[in-house]
A protein has these predicted regions:
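Conserved helix/coil segment N-terminal to the catalytic DExD/H
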Residues: 53-61
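ATP-dependent carboxylate-amine ligase
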Residues: 99, 123-125, 179-354
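A short acidic, helix-capping loop that chelates divalent metal ions and anchors anionic groups
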Residues: 13-19, 75-81, 251, 276-278, ...
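Residue-level signal for inorganic ion chemistry
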Residues: 6, 31, 49, 71, ...
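Conserved nucleotide-sensing/catalytic segment adjacent to the nucleotide-binding pocket
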Residues: 17, 21-51
């Protein structure tokens, strides 16, 4: 089936990327234009990300939504919403105010559990997904040569298949998409056949081998995402883990010390650097990250992200550290935002240029 797609990364029709995206959820006029363009190209399905900003600003008003999906919930955007309750209320608008025909909710977060119960109480057709407990769609994982071996149970039927990702976090999102296909009548056996051919987004626990050094690039920029990613790497590797990250300027400040503590807890060494400082003082951001860290022995600071990445790789090579480097926060992004200016910068390109 032909399809259209609007996301943090781009707007595409039938797999062809038409334009890059600055907003996770475009304004209402742009949304309807993209939908019109997709339909004129004979698209049958259109998928889009619904951000809390977009929901709060009613950018999705007027859409006829077949499936609303909650993949996860994490501490983010409190600079905009003010508190976690307001952030949750914005998310709930997709499910309670826009009246989708069917709801799919991952219940592996406390908010997911609460939302799932609320939807059922409101007699909304709702399905649960979990990688932790019993649910309508339940997935368990094992390591495989290409990534993860998945056992998916749906409506009393089990199927095993492989995914080309090492991330259970990302695999859970894929299961949410598969749930839509199953509810649309596609057989689980058919989905299993194509699972290993699924093309994953760039910068989502993307593995790179550089001079025998194992490096991962990941978009993790919230406490929950960083913790999930680091836990994943600790499960996958016995070697020392280095974590390089920063926090965005003029954004949710409350998450900074949380991310600092998480990075220290699950890493052997932490490199703090810039991640879109915007017009906020760079060292103020770093000091916020460090505010609840007691021991500084395993912490280093290099505000120049390009140099921080290059230096970390070279230092690990020079000192024969047979470890794993996680470069977190920017993922697919191709820029660094400083004082209202965008400078070209891509983590993967920096690695490949060495």
């Amino acid at each position: 089936y032909k399809s259209g797609f609007m996301s943090t990364i781009n707007f595409s029709k039938d797999g062809l990327i038409l334009e890059k995206s600055d907003l996770t959820t475009p304004d209402a006029i742009k949304i309807h234009k993209n939908i019109k363009d997709s339909l004129e190209s004979d698209a049958i399905y259109i998928a889009m990300e619904a951000s809390s900003h977009g929901l709060e600003q009613d950018r999705l008003i007027g859409l006829d939504i077949d499936y609303a999906i909650l993949t996860s919930f994490s501490h983010d955007h409190l600079d905009y919403h003010g508190d976690i309750q307001s952030y949750q209320s914005a998310k709930e608008k997709l499910f309670l105010d826009l009246n989708p025909k069917k709801n799919i909710v991952c219940i592996d977060s406390s908010f997911g559990k609460k939302l799932h119960s609320k939807l059922l109480k409101n007699n909304k057709e709702t399905y649960s997904i979990s990688i932790k407990e019993n649910a309508d769609f339940h997935a368990s994982f094992e390591k495989s040569p290409i990534g993860l071996k998945v056992n998916l149970k749906a409506f009393e039927k089990n199927h095993t298949f492989e995914l080309k990702t090492f991330s259970r976090y990302l695999a859970s999102n894929i299961i949410c998409s598969m749930a839509v296909l199953i509810l649309e009548g596609v057989k689980l056996s058919e989905i299993s056949k194509i699972a290993k051919d699924i093309v994953l987004p760039q910068g989502r626990l993307e593995r790179i081998i550089k001079n025998q050094q194992v490096i991962y690039i990941d978009y993790a920029h919230t406490p929950e995402a960083l913790e999930c990613t680091l836990k994943e790497l600790n499960n996958m590797h016995n070697e020392p883990i280095w974590c390089l990250f920063g926090c965005g300027g003029n954004r949710d400040k409350d998450k900074r010390p949380l991310m600092g503590k998480i990075a220290q807890k699950y890493s052997n060494h932490v490199v703090l650097t810039n991640d879109n400082p915007r017009d906020e003082d760079e060292m103020d951001i770093i000091n916020d990250i460090l505010s609840e860290i007691k021991e500084m022995e395993q912490i280093s600071i290099n505000l120049d992200r390009k140099d921080a990445i290059e230096s970390s790789i070279l230092e690990m090579e020079r000192n024969h550290i047979n470890g794993v480097l996680l470069i977190a926060g920017k993922g697919h992004e191709n820029y660094q935002e400083v004082n209202d200016n965008l400078y070209e910068l891509n983590d993967k390109n920096i690695i490949n240029s060495l």
